[in-house]
Amino acid sequence: MKAVGIAKWRIPAFWFGLVATVVLGIVRPASAQMLEGTLSITFAAFGTADAMTTGKERTVLAIDENGLSVSNGVLNHMTWHCSGLAEFTNGVAQTQGFCAGRDRVGNQAIFNWESEKHAPDQKVVRGTFTWSGGTGKYAGIRGDGTYVDYSGEFRPLTEGAIVSYLVFEGSYKTPATQ
């Protein structure tokens, strides 16, 4: 019996297998690749601010709020819990804190924020933020950006309550998990 044609396929099959193994071994899996881009997030929240006077010219507000955000893609439809401090010293105010957010399936992202120094009654305040961590598809998130806080244009319904309305613009980079 002759094995016609089988021998002529052994060498090309060997090379195909070798090339496929090398290519698949070199290409990083999708889970190790980085996702990165720009983002635009609209954020709205409500909460409380507890004031403590710590001297003749210094007042500190402890801020605690819950909110939600919508975005242009990444981090869309998130709920957030934010905490921070607003310090008013000698007619100059500045706020800083952090927010932890969760998406619809439970992935979390965390960022730190800090406002510019501003007048206490200033209606619109600018600031910066930095991504500092996350879980799930946001694990390892990094990046930063700016925000514009329009909260001073709104009046809360009750004393001691605060409302927030901010627009964030920035960048992110995170390992892909999909």
Residue ranges and their predicted role:
Residues 1, 17-18, 121:
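Compositionally biased, intrinsically disordered low-complexity regions used as flexible
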Residues 4, 24, 29-32:
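Glycine-centered signal
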